[in-house]
């Protein structure tokens, strides 16, 4: 899930909160779909795996995504709308997209992912920017410490700096718009699933390795807000610069 600068600004001026959609489909069993039907975003992949989005990942719309974000992850209307509107550049003429459409490089998908290879990295001759990379994930966990420490803004800042250096070494580039997306993407799971400023390590493993939101996330009805996400992005940059 990604948030562009333009859609963030629009979201901040989205007043009112329409009533949270009531679920009419309770078949949210986790059934992992094939990678051929998935994109580089583990969050949207998880929503499809759990039935909040069509399980085949096809013919999605921003409205469907917004409803899924509000239903499954209890996002506020401004946050869900801002995230779903960021998908507009990959829509077909009929207003739909498929999850694999998100693989298009430097539109929404971008370099410096925590768990995916950069598109043009020397060790990525096939330009595979969507497959989960276990070694990258282990490096991410190691940034938080050698034991079972949780993921915090401080450890995320360490990950952010490390991935920036690795990407630059491999020739990766980010424009201002995608830099903003990358900052908020780095803290997005913390905003969605964190408690007490921390992500429990087991939860993080479930999310990235299985592409599934654990019950403790979907059953936590606290509202996730756009301002909360932006605040965490600012704090991340503070840690990057000063910590």
Question: Which residues fall in each region the model found?
Answer:
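Polar/charged low-complexity regulatory segments
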Residues: 2-43, 47-48, 52-243
